[in-house]
Amino acid sequence: GYGSINSLSQVLLKMTLPGVPDFYQGCELWDFSLVDPDNRRPVDFDSRRSILRHMKKEEGQRGHRESLWRERKKGWIKLYLIWKTLEIRRKFKCVFDEGEYLPLRVAGRQKNSIIAFMRKYDSCWIMAAVPRLLTGFMHEGLAPAQAEWGDTFILLASAALPSSPNAIAIGTHSFP
């Protein structure tokens, strides 16, 4: 529900905003432990490797991401988001190491429910957007894409867009 969405939003922000993302070992899945000494328990890395192998095998299969959302209580969806975002960070290292941060404006009825920005380095651009404050217009259990966004949209100023006619979207990562 809402907690899952908030957690995933925080993960994506942590991994795409300026700075170095920091993860506690073992927090790649949902972690409901409290503070010290609970967070000092041994981490089951074999389990995480096994889950990641399974997700890599299933990647691209029809309905894979939808099943991650449906079964989000397992926590695999968080590991999936970390894995895919780390792939993007590796592929576009210069953007995250040296790139600019450009906040984007959002307009429309639910404008306060989206945080959006671009990261830019030279001719390379990455855009990130996450939902927030969903309880007022989205039913518990739905995925953000199923919310009633109405006329809400992200404003892309012409100065913030690539000028090259060869600029293409490399892909989107969203959940149902």
Where would I find each of the regions flagged by the language model?
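Carbohydrate-interacting/catalytic domains
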Residues: 1-176
